[in-house]
Design a protein with these regions (language model features):
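Short, structured coil/loop segments at alpha-helix boundaries
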Residues: 90, 109-112, 275, 282, ...
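Active-site phosphate-binding and catalytic loops of NTP-dependent enzymes
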Residues: 149, 297-304
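Intracellular alpha-helical coupling/juxtamembrane segments of multi-pass membrane proteins
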Residues: 243-296
């Protein structure tokens, strides 16, 4: 659990957010959204102590552990991949290092024996005997092959380092997990793995992401940073966006009766909660939506930019025709073969591949 009390952050005369009071509870995943520069990453930095708030306090639950997705990909270059992941649980890692030092001593004293006994008890409590296998499981899930688990971090590619940093953040089942853009540089398969992992995560998660699909998949709540204020809403990104747009339309339609507006909002909540998939996080989200009061739905003050292309003439029905298209790399890897398709006016097409250069 994370409690944010009367927190403000100000740089010079610029106030990023002011008088924030929020509570993030276990079993929920909170998607933090806002325009670029609104203060999403700064809010996370304030929570994990990298930046002191101008006013207010931030507190974790008693004895709870906080884990953060590291953005420094060079700090760990001298360590192996396995050690880097296990260092994510600082308490367990410290115990492991102390054990190694004591067991390596030639002049082992009675006092050392008592200390070792104490360390062994803590080591067992933290499931230290499964430390490496747990780390290996995370690494494999995130696409780091077993033959690289004991490679030095400095020998990995940038994209591989991102995955190891993510494994480090997830390691040891932390009570509170902060993730800033966790899907960057991940392929579709790994993003799907992460979605499933977080959807069944039992503790508190705060995540900043520009990936709407990812936020919809994992989040039970949406935290909106907008014009210096931070507001929390039940539901994932799509629910927040669609409900706020509905509330805005109702606000603009002054002629509609209050009862009609309320009925429309209630029907929207029912439809949305009925479509929520079954997982620990989404079940929690469904319960939140079912309890949601329509008065809690407010229109967003956010304004979205629009890019409008005006063609010089009306295009024809067929925009693009592709026939027999093939491509392979210099190494002979086939990226695609004998591709045939047409794109017609009005079509919206997305290209997906497990091979990123395709």
């Amino acid at each position: 659990m994370i409690t944010v009390s009367n927190v403000s952050v100000q740089f010079g005369k610029r106030v990023l957010f002011n008088d924030v009071n929020l509570k993030f509870t276990s079993g929920n995943c909170y998607g933090i959204i806002g325009a670029n520069g609104a203060g999403k990453s700064t809010f996370l930095r304030t929570i994990y102590g990298d930046l002191d708030p101008t006013t207010g306090t931030i507190a974790l639950g008693p004895g709870e552990r906080l884990s953060v997705l590291s953005q420094d990909h060079f700090k760990w270059d001298a360590y192996t991949v396995m050690d880097t992941v296990m260092m994510g649980h600082t308490v367990l890692w410290d115990i492991m290092k102390q054990r190694e030092v004591l067991y390596a001593k030639e002049d082992f004293t009675d006092e050392d024996g008592l200390k070792v006994s104490e360390l062994e008890e803590k080591f067992a409590e933290l499931d230290g005997w499964n430390a490496e296998s747990d780390a290996a499981m995370l690494l494999s899930g995130l696409g780091i092959k077993e033959d690289k688990h004991y490679t030095l971090m400095g020998e990995l590619s940038g994209k591989e380092k991102v995955r190891v940093m993510l494994a480090q953040a997830l390691y040891g089942n932390p009570d509170n997990l902060l993730l800033d853009e966790p899907t960057n540089d991940l392929d579709m398969e790994t993003v799907t793995w992460l979605e499933e992992y977080l959807s069944n995560f039992e503790h508190t998660v705060l995540v900043v992401s520009h990936d709407r699909h990812f936020l919809d998949s994992v989040c039970t709540h949406t935290v909106d940073i907008d014009y210096g204020k931070i507001n929390m809403f039940a539901g994932n990104y799509s629910f927040w966006y669609e409900s706020s747009q509905l509330a805005l339309r109702q606000q603009q339609n002054q002629k509609a009766k209050a009862e009609e507006k309320k009925k429309e909002l209630e029907e929207f909540i029912r439809r949305f909660s009925a479509n929520v998939a079954k997982s620990k996080q989404t079940t929690s989200r469904k319960k939140m939506l079912e309890k949601l009061n329509v008065e809690e739905i407010k229109p967003s003050s956010r304004k979205y930019p629009g890019i409008i292309f005006t063609p010089e003439r009306e295009p024809g029905n067929q925009i693009l025709e592709v026939s027999g298209l093939s491509k392979k790399t210099e190494e002979g890897v086939v990226l695609f073969s004998d591709v045939n398709f047409n794109i017609e006016k009005g079509d919206k097409v997305v290209f997906l591949s497990l091979i990123h250069i395709s």
